Amino acid sequence: MTTAIVGVGNIGSTVARHLTAGGESVVLAAKDLSRAQALAEELGPLARAASVEEAISEADAVLFAVWLDTMRELIREQADLLTGKVVIDPSNPIGFDASGQLMRTLPDGESSGSIVAALLPAEAHYVKAFGTLGADALAVSANRDPLAVLFYATDDDDADKTINRLIRAAGFEPWKAGGVDAAGRIEAPAGDLHQYGFNGEVVDLARARTATAGSRA
């Protein structure tokens, strides 16, 4: 199995490091190909760099580690190549105002997950994942004892199987929050199952079970 990671900023590079450390193959793509090449060289034989089109074509799963607006553009441009792929969406509807303060970029009640899922071709397999921790926490929380949880949301069986494999390979415990209608719960800035909703805490399986009791699909 190969996972394409489009975007090698804080989240993309961290996920790539965790996955290759867990034995998964990745192909990296970025607007600046030289950045993807440099990261691939750092990560070793399980990683290579390619154009966005080549990365998606070669992969079984595609993680778009980019801002929501950029993801929208990429999905429209690459829709044909995404048919049959597991598409992993770590986006959060956040940005910064003129004073540099974090702000929500979508209306209350609308999740970035619902937007992304609706843009994909019907034959794609969508899952919301790898965006429930801040980049710093994601980088340092792999392979804890007990394992830290990464929540995910999907309605798709193929995506469910794939994301369980990848989250475990990355050194975390997967825990399903629900279907796409639960995506907002695992998104910043206000999702109760995002790290922000736990007051910055990185939770384990026991805490995740308690937090989703009665609501988990």
Give the positions of each predicted feature:
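NAD(P)+-binding Rossmann beta1-loop-alpha1 motif at the extreme N-terminus of oxidoreductases
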Residues: M1-P45
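Short, well-ordered coil/turn residues at beta-beta hairpins
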Residues: A65-V66, P90, A129, A153
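Short, conserved loop/helix-junction motifs that constitute active-site signature segments
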Residues: Q78-G84, L119-P121, R144
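Short beta-strand and adjoining strand-loop segment in the mid-core
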Residues: Q101-G109, S114, V140-D158
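Rossmann-fold dehydrogenase core element
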Residues: L106-F130
